[in-house]
Amino acid sequence: AIIVPTAMMSVYTHYKHNAVDFGVLKSYGIFVVFGVILGSFFAASLHTKSLILFFSIVMYLLALNLIFLKEKTKIKLKFSLFQRTFFGLIVGFVSSLMGIGGAIMNVPILKFVGYTINKSIGSAASIGFLIAIFGCLGFLISGIIIKTNIPLSYGFINIPAFLIFIPITIIM
């Protein structure tokens, strides 16, 4: 839940610098949201060790991708419906399982389809805000459904941690 206000601040900052493409937010973000919803309910059914293993493998693969990623010389802006659906569902699903905003995946994807680095980063931040909101709702609802009974929590959201860390994360 802490990611919601920090993502909101990030989007606002990128928006002020004209680095958010709202077209990609609408046309791609909807598929990311579906992936987040599926992922948050799936994550609630997994054991902690499974999530740790999944997180480790995905981080390793993402690191390899960043190491070997090559810049495109010709930029052709084309983000087909198939690409938006495929990447959106995967990014949303993986982001919710890992508890991340998805920029580590969305920036390379948006660069791959031809967005400038500034638009890729700003648009990835705006998509991260969608991931934050729907991930938070998904973990809230799935935690209530499976009756987590975690003290001082609603679903998987710990209220004291949320209240303590919000001021710290927004200031930074």
Where are these regions (language model features)?
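Transmembrane helix-bundle signature of multi-pass membrane transporters/permeases
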Residues: A1-I3, A124-A132
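Juxtamembrane transmembrane-helix boundary motif
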Residues: A7-G92, L97, I109-K119, F129, ...
